[in-house]
Amino acid sequence: MIYDTLNNLPNYLGMSDNLDAVIEFVMARDINNLPAGKTRIDGDKAVVTVSTVTPQTSDKALFQRRDDHLTLETDLEGSELFEVSLGELTPTKPTDEAADLTVGTAGTSIAGMLCEGRFALYLAGEPYKSGLKAQGCGK
């Protein structure tokens, strides 16, 4: 997992071709003006998804894991908490192969705050939760 500011995003060029495609896409435009839904980048190399999330408490959210790709998240407005598991994911239902998505429970995790100007990059195979409500912050 990488947690940093969007200003530092270019520092991560060269980690993977797919990540490079996302970084170049994000840095070349005002991401606040992207349309809702999915935007494909460079064919099927990467996808940018813009969506509205209603934060939920951590105990109501399952961890998710994507085995074949990285996931980069940022908040265009507001803030949310995220968690990254330090242990293995125990699936609660079969993997959705088409979406490269496995959901389930996991042990000990670390938490962080995602807000405007920051990003979290979840590595392939890394269980994480996002869109979590920060206690007392209204988001």
Where on the chain are the PLM-derived regions?
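Short acidic (Asp/Glu) patches
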Residues: 51-67, 95-108
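Short, conserved beta-strand element in jelly-roll/cupin
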Residues: 67-80, 86-88, 95-104
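Short, surface-exposed secondary-structure edge patches
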Residues: 72, 110-112
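Conserved metal-binding segment of the jelly-roll/cupin
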Residues: 104-105, 112-133
